[in-house]
């Protein structure tokens, strides 16, 4: 089973677009897009991971 991952190396960003491309985090929370998710990953010091693409 391949691990699903997102490259968050360019984050955090001060503002995210309103683009809707949901991702489900390991915290079982749906993030609206990669930017919102990656900002949360940075805030969590890397403890938050991607569960899967799409809504939780």
Curated annotation (Swiss-Prot):
Glycans are attached at residue 45. Its main location: secreted. Keywords: Disulfide bond, Glycoprotein, Protease inhibitor, Repeat, Secreted, Serine protease inhibitor. The record marks 18-19 as: Reactive bond 3. SUPFAM superfamilies: Kazal-type serine protease inhibitors (SSF100895). Residues 6-56 form the Kazal-like domain. This is Ovomucoid.
């Amino acid at each position: 089973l391949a691990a699903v991952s997102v490259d968050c190396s360019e984050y955090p960003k001060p503002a995210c677009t309103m683009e809707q491309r949901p991702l489900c985090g390991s915290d079982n929370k749906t993030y609206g897009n990669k930017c919102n998710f990656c900002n949360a990953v940075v805030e969590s010091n890397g403890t938050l991971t991607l569960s899967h693409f799409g809504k939780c």
